Amino acid sequence: MVFSSLPVNQFDSQNWQQQGNQHQLECVTTDQNPNNYLRQLSSPPTSQVAGSSQARVNSMVERARIAKVPLPEAALNCPRCDSTNTKFCYFNNYSLTQPRHFCKTCRRYWTRGGSLRNVPVGGGFRRNKRSKSRSKSTVVVSTDNTTSTSSLTSRPSYSNPSKFHSYGQIPEFNSNLPILPPLQSLGDYNSSNTGLDFGGTQISNMISGMSSSGGILDAWRIPPSQQAQQFPFLINTTGLVQSSNALYPLLEGGVSATQTRNVKAEENDQDRGRDGDGVNNLSRNFLGNININSGRNEEYTSWGGNSSWTGFTSNNSTGHLSF
């Protein structure tokens, strides 16, 4: 393999040593004075000096110095806030006769012979930003607290049951509704001694309360003079109650007249065996005194009186219970 670009004698080791010795001799002869070598390194080429001078001349400050334009005085009054806390920034890039100034008070630039900048440059300092953000957050929290307290004061707290002694104290709940009777008579719907904390009411009281409070039955009232003419078969019947205002039908099922006697007889027994929660007494009062009179003569009495099913009689031929 032959390299045409390199001479053959360079591959000999003796020739390499001779060339190295010659290079060292040349360095010693040329560099006898080391100061000359440092001067040569420190001095840039002439082309570089010309290029750097050209770049300096291109700056506006250098052009102003070459043109012998005096620098404007530093303490100029700001045309916006009339403050003397101003400084000279630089000349205009297009004209040396328009220097640009900056006001440290209102943080705005202005150019001589030009317009004033209305928008402040940059934001506030970081310290001022933090203080402002904290103050804003506290203001927001305080406003939230005021709104929450105002809303709590304007609306009653429904979690406290002590405020429900009377419904009239609640501003959003009106007891005189047109479709309901007065709420004072709601506790009268059952007979006494049921083991609960409210008494009973009558249906007539409920109807009278509905008619007096809301007046929704006014359109359905029948004058007394027309009752005998239009409904002669409804007068003096057991299923209707006649009043001066209207005829109101009562809801009556298949309960016999002996129910009232049995209820009175069972009141003393229920007082003796009354439990703490009142649930058993409620079931006794409801189920223990029902007489079902049908064609098969089936009678169910005294359920739950003393927790025993006594008095059960049946005349059914089949002999099994039927409910």
Swiss-Prot record:
InterPro entries linked: Dof, Znf_Dof
Localization per record: Nucleus
One term of GO molecular function: DNA binding
Tissue expression as described in the entry: Predominantly expressed in roots.
Low complexity bias spans: 136-159
Ligand binding (Zn(2+)): C78, C81, C103, C106
Superkingdom per UniProt: Eukaryota
UniProt keywords, alphabetically: DNA-binding, Metal-binding, Nucleus, Transcription, Transcription regulation, Zinc, Zinc-finger
Zinc finger extent (Dof-type): 76-130
A family per Pfam: Zn_ribbon_Dof
Induction remarks: By auxin and salicylic acid (SA). Repressed by jasmonic acid (JA).
Region (Disordered) residue spans: 121-160, 304-323
Primary location group: nucleus
Compositionally biased intervals (Basic residues): 126-135
GO-annotated cellular components: nucleus
UniProt cross-references to PANTHER family, sorted A to Z: DOF ZINC FINGER PROTEIN DOF1.4-RELATED (PTHR31992), DOF ZINC FINGER PROTEIN DOF3.6 (PTHR31992:SF193)
Quaternary structure and partners: Interacts with OBF4.
Function as written in the Swiss-Prot or TrEMBL entry: Transcription factor that binds specifically to a 5'-AA[AG]G-3' consensus core sequence. Enhances the DNA binding of OBF transcription factors to OCS elements.
Protein known as: Dof zinc finger protein DOF3.6
Organism phylogeny: Eukaryota, Viridiplantae, Streptophyta, Embryophyta, Tracheophyta
